[in-house]
Amino acid sequence: MNHTGDEDLKKFLEGLIENDMNSEIEELKALLKVNGVALPPAPPERPVASIEDIPPGARINDVEIAAAVSTGLAAGLVTCSQVMGKCLREDVGMLFGQFHMKKAQAGVTLLRLSKKKGWVVPPPLHVRNSDQA
């Protein structure tokens, strides 16, 4: 978040953290507490910094941030699918199904934003010549 210069990407990340990630964390904390599982220690939150405070050579650019978040969302989709497939408790499986849906929606939103900003470069089209057939 501290490295983001694009306002649309910053809004997306804030919404992703506030609406999706924090709600997932709270739901999982509640599930663990109900089942008597001790919560692991969490690191302290990082302070908010201005992008101007970060030296230009140390900044992560918006394209890299969007790609990393997209990769994280894709990994989250796979993880949620694995939990749903292996889960014996229906309530936990449904919970991860909800997480899966939120991650899929966030992925589509990020893809649209990335296309709009020109951050997604489509690969060259493969044209088959009649000589190659």
Where are these predicted regions, by residue range?
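Generic signature of intrinsically disordered, low-complexity segments enriched in small/polar residues
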Residues: 15, 99-102, 122
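Glycine-rich, aromatic-bearing surface loops/beta-hairpins
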Residues: 108-109, 118-132
